Amino acid sequence: LSVYLDATFFPNLNELDFMQEGHRFDFVENDKSKDQIVLKGIVYNEMKGAMSSISSQADQGLNENLFTNHTYGYNSGGDPQDIPKLTYQNLLKFHEKHYHPSNAIFFTYGKIDIPALQNEIQINVLKHFSPSAEKIEVKESKSFRKPKYALKNYKPLSNDENNHHVLVSWLLGTSLDPVDKMEAKLIESVLLENSASPLSKALEVTNLGSVPSDMTSFDTYKKQMYFTAGLEGVSA
């Protein structure tokens, strides 16, 4: 436990590690262009791969427009276009602000000695901090008064013009009530469980697109739920 607490609240990240893990300029490793410089970094390369698919770009575009200027509107792993803008000092400031015990909830589970566990947290973490006045919370995104339309461009996989991805989403209420979440997943099951389900069938047989979007679902994992239906392979 002490190792996890130390790694979370007191990570040992020096600037050289940041350059390796985050982003840096490096030489191309091949015989043809030894003098060519490229942008590298473990996290940078990971996020380039994660955001290379059409679905991941569409999902990010959807969240940006459903949750404008909101926590959920930002790529949690880092947008590859923005990662090179991050500085070492800004990362330290972010950690200092957000990874503070005042912004933490400690959960315990199982048949364990709770007082002993709390004492270990006190010794390893809490006694090293003072209460923070920062109020960090995930606020509710504002409801839409009218439909919102958004367009996001991506590099197509081919020159096929029937390669558009169209999504329709409804931003709903909070998902704090487990009964509401269960009912939402039940509705999703009725609509999308298999090819005979009404919405799945409608999306599969329509000539408006080639296949249903794999983002067609009821999302109950954020503070506010939202329902999405869509098609891939839509013509221009």
Located regions from the model:
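Charge-rich, well-structured scaffold segments of protease-associated domains
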Residues: 1-146, 152-183, 189-199, 205-236
